[in-house]
From Swiss-Prot:
Cofactor(s) in the UniProt record: Zn(2+)
GO molecular function, one term: acetyl-CoA carboxylase activity
Pathway named in the protein's UniProt entry: Lipid metabolism; malonyl-CoA biosynthesis; malonyl-CoA from acetyl-CoA: step 1/1
UniProt name for this protein: Acetyl-coenzyme A carboxylase carboxyl transferase subunit beta, chloroplastic
Species of the source: Angiopteris lygodiifolia (Turnip fern)
Quaternary state and interactors: Acetyl-CoA carboxylase is a heterohexamer composed of biotin carboxyl carrier protein, biotin carboxylase and 2 subunits each of ACCase subunit alpha and ACCase plastid-coded subunit beta (accD).
Zinc finger (C4-type): 51-73
Entry similarity comment: Belongs to the AccD/PCCB family.
Keyword list, A-Z: ATP-binding, Chloroplast, Fatty acid biosynthesis, Fatty acid metabolism, Lipid biosynthesis, Lipid metabolism, Metal-binding, Nucleotide-binding, Plastid, Transferase, Zinc, Zinc-finger
EC number(s) from the headed UniProt entry: 2.1.3.15
Classification via Pfam families: Carboxyl_trans
Keyword Cytoplasm belongs to the record: no
Domain CoA carboxyltransferase N-terminal residues, every copy: 47-314
InterPro entries: AcCoA_carboxyl_beta, Acetyl_CoA_COase_Trfase_b_su, ClpP/crotonase-like_dom_sf, COA_CT_N
Amino acid sequence: MSLINWFEEKRKFGGLIGAFIEKATKGYVLSEREKDRYINVDTNKGLWTRCDNCENMLYIKFLKQNKGVCEECGYHLQINSTERIELLIDRDTWIPMDEDMVAQDVLKFSDEDSYRNRISLSQKRTGLTDAVQTGIGNLNGTPVALGVMDFQSMGGSMGSVVGEKITRLIEYATQESLPLIIVCASGGARMQEGTLSSMQMAKISSVSQIHQVQKKLLYIAVLTYPTTGGVTASFGMLGDIIIAEPKAYIAFAGKRVIEQTLRQKIPDGFQVAESLFDHGLLDSIVPRNLLKGVLSEIFELYDLAPWKEKNNQV
Protein backbone atom coordinates (compact mmCIF):
# COMPACT_ATOMS: atom_id res chain seq x y z
CA MET A 1 0.00 0.00 0.00
CA SER A 2 1.35 3.42 -0.94
CA LEU A 3 1.67 6.19 1.64
CA ILE A 4 -1.07 8.20 -0.05
CA ASN A 5 -3.48 5.23 -0.01
CA TRP A 6 -2.64 4.57 3.63
CA PHE A 7 -3.27 8.22 4.43
CA GLU A 8 -6.65 8.16 2.67
CA GLU A 9 -7.64 5.02 4.56
CA LYS A 10 -6.77 6.67 7.87
CA ARG A 11 -8.99 9.59 6.95
CA LYS A 12 -11.95 7.32 6.25
CA PHE A 13 -11.65 5.57 9.58
CA GLY A 14 -11.80 8.09 12.38
CA GLY A 15 -11.29 11.32 10.45
CA LEU A 16 -7.62 11.52 11.56
CA ILE A 17 -8.65 12.44 15.12
CA GLY A 18 -7.95 9.12 16.75
CA ALA A 19 -10.25 6.53 15.26
CA PHE A 20 -13.33 5.40 17.15
CA ILE A 21 -12.69 7.79 20.03
CA GLU A 22 -16.38 7.93 20.89
CA LYS A 23 -16.48 4.16 21.34
CA ALA A 24 -13.25 4.18 23.32
CA THR A 25 -14.57 6.71 25.83
CA LYS A 26 -17.55 4.43 26.48
CA GLY A 27 -15.41 1.45 27.44
CA TYR A 28 -15.37 -0.04 23.96
CA VAL A 29 -12.43 -2.39 23.34
CA LEU A 30 -10.71 -1.78 20.01
CA SER A 31 -10.06 -4.74 17.75
CA GLU A 32 -6.57 -5.30 16.35
CA ARG A 33 -7.65 -3.88 12.99
CA GLU A 34 -9.12 -0.78 14.64
CA LYS A 35 -5.97 -0.28 16.70
CA ASP A 36 -3.94 -0.29 13.49
CA ARG A 37 -6.11 2.54 12.16
CA TYR A 38 -5.79 4.56 15.37
CA ILE A 39 -3.36 7.47 15.18
CA ASN A 40 -1.64 8.07 18.51
CA VAL A 41 -0.69 11.75 18.70
CA ASP A 42 1.80 11.33 21.54
CA THR A 43 3.92 8.77 19.70
CA ASN A 44 3.78 10.58 16.34
CA LYS A 45 4.52 14.18 17.31
CA GLY A 46 7.16 14.53 14.63
CA LEU A 47 4.81 13.33 11.90
CA TRP A 48 1.39 14.72 12.78
CA THR A 49 -0.17 17.91 14.05
CA ARG A 50 -3.71 18.95 14.89
CA CYS A 51 -5.71 21.64 13.10
CA ASP A 52 -6.60 24.45 15.52
CA ASN A 53 -9.99 24.89 13.84
CA CYS A 54 -11.48 21.48 12.95
CA GLU A 55 -9.11 19.45 15.21
CA ASN A 56 -8.42 16.91 12.48
CA MET A 57 -5.01 15.28 12.52
CA LEU A 58 -2.79 16.46 9.65
CA TYR A 59 0.30 14.77 8.24
CA ILE A 60 3.03 17.41 8.60
CA LYS A 61 4.73 16.61 5.29
CA PHE A 62 1.49 17.14 3.35
CA LEU A 63 0.63 20.19 5.48
CA LYS A 64 3.90 21.88 4.50
CA GLN A 65 3.27 21.08 0.86
CA ASN A 66 -0.11 22.79 1.29
CA LYS A 67 1.61 25.92 2.71
CA GLY A 68 0.31 25.32 6.22
CA VAL A 69 -3.36 25.28 5.19
CA CYS A 70 -5.60 22.52 6.57
CA GLU A 71 -6.83 20.40 3.66
CA GLU A 72 -9.96 19.45 5.60
CA CYS A 73 -11.39 22.89 6.51
CA GLY A 74 -9.08 25.40 4.79
CA TYR A 75 -7.89 26.90 8.08
CA HIS A 76 -4.57 28.77 7.88
CA LEU A 77 -2.23 27.43 10.55
CA GLN A 78 0.75 29.43 11.75
CA ILE A 79 3.96 29.13 9.75
CA ASN A 80 7.36 30.55 10.65
CA SER A 81 9.05 33.56 9.08
CA THR A 82 11.43 31.50 6.94
CA GLU A 83 8.51 29.63 5.38
CA ARG A 84 6.78 32.92 4.61
CA ILE A 85 9.89 34.31 2.94
CA GLU A 86 10.10 31.18 0.78
CA LEU A 87 6.41 31.61 -0.03
CA LEU A 88 6.76 35.22 -1.23
CA ILE A 89 10.31 35.75 -2.50
CA ASP A 90 11.76 34.35 -5.73
CA ARG A 91 14.38 31.64 -5.25
CA ASP A 92 17.98 32.82 -4.67
CA THR A 93 17.04 36.53 -4.51
CA TRP A 94 16.68 36.98 -0.73
CA ILE A 95 19.27 39.25 0.92
CA PRO A 96 18.76 39.46 4.72
CA MET A 97 19.47 42.61 6.72
CA ASP A 98 20.70 43.17 10.30
CA GLU A 99 20.83 39.47 11.21
CA ASP A 100 23.34 40.06 14.03
CA MET A 101 21.16 42.49 16.01
CA VAL A 102 20.41 41.08 19.49
CA ALA A 103 18.22 42.44 22.31
CA GLN A 104 19.82 43.63 25.55
CA ASP A 105 18.26 43.16 28.99
CA VAL A 106 18.60 46.82 29.94
CA LEU A 107 15.94 46.67 32.69
CA LYS A 108 17.26 43.37 34.15
CA PHE A 109 13.66 42.17 33.94
CA SER A 110 12.67 38.93 35.63
CA ASP A 111 9.35 37.23 36.41
CA GLU A 112 9.16 33.43 36.42
CA ASP A 113 12.38 33.49 34.43
CA SER A 114 14.85 36.21 33.49
CA TYR A 115 14.42 38.06 30.20
CA ARG A 116 17.96 37.11 29.22
CA ASN A 117 17.16 33.40 29.59
CA ARG A 118 13.92 33.76 27.66
CA ILE A 119 15.78 35.36 24.75
CA SER A 120 18.45 32.65 24.81
CA LEU A 121 15.90 29.81 24.82
CA SER A 122 13.94 31.43 22.00
CA GLN A 123 17.08 31.81 19.90
CA LYS A 124 18.00 28.15 20.38
CA ARG A 125 14.47 26.97 19.57
CA THR A 126 13.87 29.09 16.45
CA GLY A 127 17.37 29.84 15.16
CA LEU A 128 16.43 33.54 15.01
CA THR A 129 18.06 36.39 16.92
CA ASP A 130 14.67 38.06 17.43
CA ALA A 131 11.04 38.07 16.32
CA VAL A 132 11.41 39.54 12.82
CA GLN A 133 13.37 38.83 9.65
CA THR A 134 14.00 41.73 7.27
CA GLY A 135 15.63 41.92 3.88
CA ILE A 136 15.44 42.61 0.17
CA GLY A 137 14.29 40.23 -2.55
CA ASN A 138 12.33 39.84 -5.75
CA LEU A 139 8.63 39.04 -5.84
CA ASN A 140 7.87 37.71 -9.33
CA GLY A 141 10.75 39.85 -10.56
CA THR A 142 9.80 43.02 -8.66
CA PRO A 143 12.41 44.20 -6.09
CA VAL A 144 10.75 44.65 -2.69
CA ALA A 145 11.70 45.34 0.91
CA LEU A 146 10.18 42.65 3.12
CA GLY A 147 9.77 42.30 6.87
CA VAL A 148 8.28 39.10 8.32
CA MET A 149 7.42 38.78 12.00
CA ASP A 150 7.70 35.36 13.64
CA PHE A 151 5.23 34.46 16.39
CA GLN A 152 7.33 31.46 17.41
CA SER A 153 10.04 33.85 18.64
CA MET A 154 8.96 35.53 21.89
CA GLY A 155 5.36 35.52 20.70
CA GLY A 156 6.29 37.89 17.90
CA SER A 157 6.46 40.67 20.48
CA MET A 158 7.87 44.03 19.40
CA GLY A 159 10.94 45.03 21.37
CA SER A 160 13.83 47.36 20.60
CA VAL A 161 15.44 44.96 18.10
CA VAL A 162 12.20 44.32 16.20
CA GLY A 163 11.49 48.05 16.08
CA GLU A 164 15.01 48.94 14.97
CA LYS A 165 15.15 46.27 12.25
CA ILE A 166 11.80 47.36 10.80
CA THR A 167 12.84 51.02 11.01
CA ARG A 168 16.08 50.34 9.14
CA LEU A 169 14.18 48.30 6.55
CA ILE A 170 11.78 51.18 5.88
CA GLU A 171 14.62 53.69 5.72
CA TYR A 172 16.43 51.50 3.18
CA ALA A 173 13.25 51.07 1.15
CA THR A 174 12.79 54.85 1.16
CA GLN A 175 16.38 55.47 0.08
CA GLU A 176 16.21 52.89 -2.74
CA SER A 177 12.59 53.73 -3.74
CA LEU A 178 11.38 50.20 -3.06
CA PRO A 179 7.83 49.10 -2.24
CA LEU A 180 7.48 47.71 1.28
CA ILE A 181 5.72 44.61 2.60
CA ILE A 182 5.45 43.79 6.30
CA VAL A 183 3.87 40.49 7.35
CA CYS A 184 2.57 40.92 10.88
CA ALA A 185 2.25 38.16 13.48
CA SER A 186 2.59 39.55 16.98
CA GLY A 187 1.32 39.53 20.53
CA GLY A 188 2.08 43.26 20.78
CA ALA A 189 4.72 45.30 22.56
CA ARG A 190 7.32 43.35 24.57
CA MET A 191 6.58 43.97 28.24
CA GLN A 192 10.10 42.98 29.36
CA GLU A 193 11.49 46.13 27.72
CA GLY A 194 8.96 48.64 29.06
CA THR A 195 9.09 52.08 27.43
CA LEU A 196 11.88 50.97 25.09
CA SER A 197 9.31 48.69 23.50
CA SER A 198 6.43 51.19 23.44
CA MET A 199 8.50 53.88 21.71
CA GLN A 200 9.02 51.59 18.71
CA MET A 201 5.42 52.28 17.69
CA ALA A 202 6.10 55.98 17.18
CA LYS A 203 9.53 55.40 15.65
CA ILE A 204 8.26 53.02 12.98
CA SER A 205 5.23 55.20 12.26
CA SER A 206 7.41 58.27 11.70
CA VAL A 207 9.71 56.62 9.14
CA SER A 208 6.69 55.03 7.50
CA GLN A 209 5.22 58.50 7.00
CA ILE A 210 8.32 59.56 5.09
CA HIS A 211 8.18 56.42 2.94
CA GLN A 212 4.47 56.68 2.14
CA VAL A 213 3.58 60.37 2.20
CA GLN A 214 6.74 62.24 1.30
CA LYS A 215 8.22 59.72 -1.15
CA LYS A 216 4.85 58.31 -2.30
CA LEU A 217 6.09 54.73 -2.10
CA LEU A 218 3.78 51.76 -1.62
CA TYR A 219 3.46 49.96 1.72
CA ILE A 220 1.37 46.79 1.98
CA ALA A 221 0.58 45.35 5.41
CA VAL A 222 -0.27 41.64 5.59
CA LEU A 223 -2.01 40.71 8.84
CA THR A 224 -1.86 37.07 9.95
CA TYR A 225 -2.91 35.10 13.01
CA PRO A 226 -2.43 36.75 15.45
CA THR A 227 -1.87 40.50 15.01
CA THR A 228 -2.53 42.32 18.27
CA GLY A 229 -1.49 45.08 20.65
CA GLY A 230 1.12 47.65 19.68
CA VAL A 231 1.63 46.21 16.20
CA THR A 232 -2.06 46.65 15.39
CA ALA A 233 -1.94 50.14 16.90
CA SER A 234 0.99 51.20 14.70
CA PHE A 235 2.40 49.89 11.43
CA GLY A 236 -0.07 46.99 11.18
CA MET A 237 -2.85 49.41 10.27
CA LEU A 238 -0.79 52.01 8.40
CA GLY A 239 -0.53 50.21 5.08
CA ASP A 240 -1.68 51.86 1.88
CA ILE A 241 -3.25 48.46 1.30
CA ILE A 242 -4.10 46.18 4.22
CA ILE A 243 -4.49 42.47 3.48
CA ALA A 244 -5.36 39.70 5.93
CA GLU A 245 -5.34 35.93 5.82
CA PRO A 246 -8.71 34.15 6.26
CA LYS A 247 -9.89 33.93 9.89
CA ALA A 248 -6.84 35.83 11.17
CA TYR A 249 -7.23 37.15 14.72
CA ILE A 250 -6.67 40.92 14.59
CA ALA A 251 -7.15 43.08 17.67
CA PHE A 252 -5.67 45.70 19.96
CA ALA A 253 -6.94 44.39 23.30
CA GLY A 254 -8.35 40.93 23.96
CA LYS A 255 -12.05 40.21 24.17
CA ARG A 256 -12.08 39.74 27.96
CA VAL A 257 -10.25 43.02 28.53
CA ILE A 258 -12.77 44.88 26.37
CA GLU A 259 -15.73 43.25 28.13
CA GLN A 260 -14.34 44.10 31.56
CA THR A 261 -13.68 47.70 30.50
CA LEU A 262 -17.04 48.32 28.79
CA ARG A 263 -18.96 46.02 31.14
CA GLN A 264 -20.95 44.56 28.30
CA LYS A 265 -20.94 41.36 26.27
CA ILE A 266 -18.98 41.43 23.02
CA PRO A 267 -20.15 39.22 20.11
CA ASP A 268 -18.04 36.22 19.16
CA GLY A 269 -15.87 36.60 16.09
CA PHE A 270 -15.80 40.40 16.05
CA GLN A 271 -11.98 40.37 16.03
CA VAL A 272 -11.68 37.94 13.12
CA ALA A 273 -10.50 39.18 9.71
CA GLU A 274 -13.89 38.65 8.06
CA SER A 275 -15.59 40.89 10.63
CA LEU A 276 -12.98 43.63 10.21
CA PHE A 277 -13.38 43.43 6.43
CA ASP A 278 -17.16 43.82 6.72
CA HIS A 279 -16.61 46.98 8.78
CA GLY A 280 -14.14 48.52 6.33
CA LEU A 281 -10.91 48.02 8.30
CA LEU A 282 -9.30 45.74 5.70
CA ASP A 283 -8.94 46.07 1.95
CA SER A 284 -8.93 42.36 1.15
CA ILE A 285 -8.78 38.85 2.59
CA VAL A 286 -6.42 36.71 0.54
CA PRO A 287 -5.76 32.96 0.98
CA ARG A 288 -2.11 32.12 1.54
CA ASN A 289 -1.61 30.24 -1.73
CA LEU A 290 -2.84 33.27 -3.73
CA LEU A 291 -0.96 35.97 -1.81
CA LYS A 292 2.15 36.17 -3.99
CA GLY A 293 0.09 36.49 -7.15
CA VAL A 294 -2.14 39.19 -5.65
CA LEU A 295 0.86 41.20 -4.45
CA SER A 296 2.46 40.89 -7.88
CA GLU A 297 -0.68 42.27 -9.56
CA ILE A 298 -0.78 45.19 -7.11
CA PHE A 299 2.83 46.08 -7.92
CA GLU A 300 2.06 45.97 -11.65
CA LEU A 301 -0.78 48.46 -11.16
CA TYR A 302 1.42 50.60 -8.92
CA ASP A 303 4.08 50.82 -11.64
CA LEU A 304 1.45 52.19 -14.03
CA ALA A 305 0.32 54.99 -11.68
CA PRO A 306 0.20 58.35 -13.57
CA TRP A 307 1.73 60.35 -10.72
CA LYS A 308 4.71 57.98 -10.66
CA GLU A 309 5.50 58.76 -14.30
CA LYS A 310 5.39 62.48 -13.52
CA ASN A 311 7.82 62.02 -10.64
CA ASN A 312 10.23 60.12 -12.90
CA GLN A 313 10.19 62.98 -15.41
CA VAL A 314 11.04 65.64 -12.82
